[in-house]
């Protein structure tokens, strides 16, 4: 090898990627992992301070504070991102809220339900619709919806969260049918119980967020339409052969 030869940087495996819920947990880990692979990231989250801290860790991460519960602002958000970063080609809907409460708990109000439904379900639908014309104009693009094993069977203390993830899973399937034959891939990333601030104090045997992020990206690069991560890889078989067992396992997850 010529000692004076300058090694050319490898091309990024993915185009610029939007990651929602990037302030902490899986979203933060996704942003860092993607950036480490050379993928530019638009990191969206509500906590501007945490986002700036994240962006300071890698030059390829751009912090974009936004509250996705403000559904009426999502169209403008998508337009602003595309205007600033016209090379955006991947949208990962990771943001999520779970109130670990029963429906009859006195502290669980209508505003909590509205927030959960908006962030977990309505925002991904609205953001996808707003960004879709741009994505369809690219040679290759991808929408990734981060769902959960709870989309298959509900958790006792997370009725609304389980319902939103089931809705997001069905939306993923419907969108995939709509976009079949187009340049836009639609991917369902099914998560197990992951160690994040949202799951603090709940359950055992949680998958580290970094491992969850790496598995998601590996599945995405492998071209998979459904990525079952960690213990969630057992969900399809259990749902088919032992649905009662799966339901009992997830009720107290």
Predicted segments, located by residue:
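C-terminal helical subdomain
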Residues: 188, 200-240, 244
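Conserved glycine-rich cofactor-binding loop
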Residues: 23-24
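Rossmann-fold cofactor-recognition segment
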Residues: 58-72
